[in-house]
Amino acid sequence: MAFVWLLGALVLIQNVLGLERTVVTTLSEGIRYSRLVTLLILVGPAEEVIFHGVIQRSLEDVIDVWAAILIGGLLFGVAHIDPAAMGGGNLFFYAAQGGFGVIVGWIYARSNNLVIPALVHGLFVAITTALPLVFG
């Protein structure tokens, strides 16, 4: 039950602070790259701690590891939903986020080390953030 509250708190914090929108706004304005770097360094590791270090690990105590990975990935995708941007291609984005959550959940289950999925997450965010900058 605690992980449900934690997930709700994460979604609320992300939406209230506008963390994902901040990255897009920062890029479109072409300023505050130090703020962008800070987001890239902090958001990925923080999400890994919450979704895999807390939620997935807690679920593994009561259900099968694969079920915990799949539920954790689903919750990861749900946490990235922006109700204001629902519909169209955004649904694919949310499904991809869930799939990414499953992949890094599997990496965590295999390695039993949060640093590895946090690095993968940070690299993924860095690449997907840099591509629009490079290819406009």
Protein language model regions, located:
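Active-site His/Glu-centered metal-binding helix of metallohydrolases
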Residues: 45-50, 54-59, 78, 82, ...
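Alpha-helical transmembrane segments of helical membrane proteins, especially in multi-pass transport
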Residues: 72-76
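Short, motif-level signal for alpha-helix interfacial/capping segments enriched in acidic residues
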Residues: 20-30, 59-60, 89-104
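Membrane-interface helix/loop boundary segments of multi-pass membrane proteins
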Residues: 46-71, 109-113
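The feature captures the transmembrane alpha-helix scaffold of multi-pass secondary transporters
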Residues: 33, 37-38, 66-70, 90
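Transmembrane alpha-helical core positions of polytopic small-molecule transporters
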Residues: 3, 35, 48, 65, ...
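Functionally important transmembrane alpha-helices
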Residues: 69, 79, 83-85, 89-136
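Juxtamembrane helix-loop-helix connectors linking adjacent transmembrane helices
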Residues: 1-46, 61
